[in-house]
Structure formats: structure tokens, C-alpha cells
């Protein structure tokens, strides 16, 4: 039983090594094809690449990172040897997905970073422009308000002018009332004078009419006619006597 388990473990190790080597070769082939299809890039220093891989391992110093790496490798070997973890199709898919994700992260992350930086720069420019416009608007408002710093004196002068205007309007109204009153009094006096003149004319007409009627009545009286005749004869006789 132990021999069969050992054989099975060796078989699993060989299969895992084969799959791992195939999985490693596939990304290398993809990278090689990309390298051949595109312009040659500057090769990175192996030491710098190794340092970047080491820095990616969690830990504060080299001992901690080495312990984490060794523990992880021992755990993987132990899990595979004791059939706690069996490499199957899902594992291959997982490794392929992780390799593809790594490639995407390596080649698309810079482009996305550039896009994000450009977007952030655009938003930052818009915000800065809005802030500058707001600052200019505030400065213009401050300038417009500073021009009204003498508003108290101006208001006082305007109040004095309005007070003087009200006084002049009051005097003009009083003069207008006086003029209208004088016109009314003159109109009343004129009407009274016309009334008195009409009364005098009426009295004169009545007096003349009464005198004329009395004279006419006296002339129609025979005694008065005889008296007038006698008086006329006597006057004529006196004139004749004077002529002789």
C-alpha cells in the first residue's frame, strides 16, 4: 500500500512537473511571439527582476520572505505528495488564468494607468479652471463692493437732496394753493361786481320806467295839460312884453 502510494506520488510529481513546465513554456511562447511581433524592448536586468519578485513576497526582511517562500513550497509539496491536492483540469485552468491575468496586469496595467492619469488630469484641470473662475468671480465681487465704500456719504448727500426736494415741493404746493385761492377769490369778486352792476342796471331801468310812466300819466291828466298850457301862455306873454 505504501509502495503504491509512493508510486502514485512519483507519478503525480512527474505529471505536475510536466504540466508546470508546459504552463511555463506557454507564457514564454506568448511572450516570445509578442516580442517578435513588436519592436524590441529594452531587456530588464535579471537582478532587478529578481529583486522585484522578492519584493512581491510578503515580509519585512529577507529572512521573513525566505521563510514564507520555503513554507509555501513545502506546503505545496506536502499537499501534492499526500494527495491533499491533486492537479487536474481545474488546476490547469487556474494556472492558465493566473498566467493570463499576469500578462494582462503586465501589459494592460500601464495603458490603464496612463488612461487613469489622463482622466484624473482632465478632471483636475476642470476643477482647477472652475476654482480659478470662482476666485476671479469673488475678486470681481470684492472690487465691485469696494467701489461702494463711500456709500454712507453718498447716502447722506442723497438724503439731504431728497429733504430739500421735499421742502421745495411743499413750498410749491403752498404757492399753488395760494394762487388757486386768489383765482377763486377773484372769480367770486368778479361775480359779485357783475351781480351789483346787473342790480344797478335793473334799478336804473326800473327808475327810468317809473319816471317815464309817471310823466306819461301826468301828461295824460287834463289839469296838468291846462296848467302847462297856462304856464306856456304866460311865458309867451312875458317874452312879448319884453320885446315891446
From Swiss-Prot:
| Molecular function, one GO term | proton transmembrane transporter activity
User: Which residue interval is the transit peptide?
Assistant: 1-35
- Work out whether the entry's keyword set contains Chloroplast: no
Q: One GO CC annotation, please?
A: proton-transporting ATP synthase complex
Task: Mark the residues carrying the PTM Phosphoserine.
Answer: 144
The record's subcellular locations are:
Mitochondrion; Mitochondrion inner membrane
Biological processes per GO annotation: protein-containing complex assembly; proton motive force-driven ATP synthesis
Keywords from UniProt, A to Z, are:
CF(0), Hydrogen ion transport, Ion transport, Membrane, Mitochondrion, Mitochondrion inner membrane, Phosphoprotein, Transit peptide, Transport
Q: According to its UniProt record, where is this protein mainly located? A: mitochondrion
**Pfam families, sorted:** Mt_ATP-synt_B
* Record note on quaternary structure: F-type ATPases have 2 components, CF(1) - the catalytic core - and CF(0) - the membrane proton channel. In yeast, the dimeric form of ATP synthase consists of 17 polypeptides: alpha, beta, gamma, delta, epsilon, 4 (B), 5 (OSCP), 6 (A), 8, 9 (C), d, E (Tim11), f, g, h, i/j and k.
Family per UniProt? Belongs to the eukaryotic ATPase B chain family.
Q: Relate the protein's function as given in its record.
A: Mitochondrial membrane ATP synthase (F(1)F(0) ATP synthase or Complex V) produces ATP from ADP in the presence of a proton gradient across the membrane which is generated by electron transport complexes of the respiratory chain. F-type ATPases consist of two structural domains, F(1) - containing the extramembraneous catalytic core, and F(0) - containing the membrane proton channel, linked together by a central stalk and a peripheral stalk. During catalysis, ATP synthesis in the catalytic domain of F(1) is coupled via a rotary mechanism of the central stalk subunits to proton translocation.
Misc. comment: Present with 12900 molecules/cell in log phase SD medium.
Stated name of the protein: ATP synthase subunit 4, mitochondrial
Q: What is the lineage of its organism?
A: Eukaryota, Fungi, Dikarya, Ascomycota, Saccharomycotina
Name of encoding gene: ATP4
